[in-house]
Amino acid sequence: MLYIKPLPSFFLTAMDRTPHRRQRISQTERVENTQRKLIDAALQLLHEEGFKGATLQAIARKAQVSLGALQHHFKTRDALMERLVQEIMEPLSAQGSIWPDRALPLPERAHDFVQRAWKNVFCTPHYQAAWSLFLGCKPSSALFAHINAQRVQVDHGFYAQFLQTFPEITDHHPHPQGVAITVFAAFRGAGVLELFDVTTTEREAFLGTLADTIAQAGQIAST
């Protein structure tokens, strides 16, 4: 009678531990991952090298992809730069991450909004990189015109969402749109100033004063 020796138990255990096949990444996910790498590389180069240094070749090297792969996703440098503007300004949209809970009391809501907007947009290296893009693309009339059109759209969307978040300003201030414009302008100016050495005291004083200004704009004026 033929005797078949059983396999050792450790061998069977090892077979049980054979890893499952890796889950396949979909084509959509691969595209999104590659575009994410390209966008991050471009923003980093804009921040470190400025607009002139953010060439397609440099961006491809930074993202560790071929120039052909980059151009498959973004046909031209202008197309990539336009996408960067959308990326940087996304938190300012109605669905963005800067808007506080409208149920909060006005002073707390103003403070929360200022902190969110500063942390998620205006103090970030990406926002500083955006200014390298804005100023650097001036000689390219087509790109500058497109970016300016996006800026107008973002500005108006911000103003509308700001006043929806702080309806007290519309109710009690004689120039609510002016308040929204002033707040946005203050953020932008302070964001650009972050390119230089700003002390913590100066920064906190700005943020606190801006939050107080928003809260005061929504209060009934004393007679």
Task: Describe each PLM feature range.
Residues 1-22, 155-164, 181-223:
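C-terminal peripheral helix-coil segments that are non-catalytic and often amphipathic
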Residues 2-49, 56-62, 79-82:
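Basic, helix-initiating cap at the start of DNA-binding domains
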Residues 33-44, 48-49, 62, 79-102, ...:
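Alpha-helical structural segments
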Residues 50-51, 71:
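Short amphipathic helical patch at the helix-1/turn junction of helix-turn-helix
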Residues 63-74:
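Short hydrophobic/aromatic patch on the recognition helix
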Residues 93, 97-98, 123-129, 141-167, ...:
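Amphipathic alpha-helical packing segments from all-alpha helical-bundle domains
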Residues 111, 173-184:
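Short, well-structured alpha-helical segments
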Residues 115-122, 129-140:
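Helix-loop "lid/cap" segments that line or gate small-molecule binding pockets
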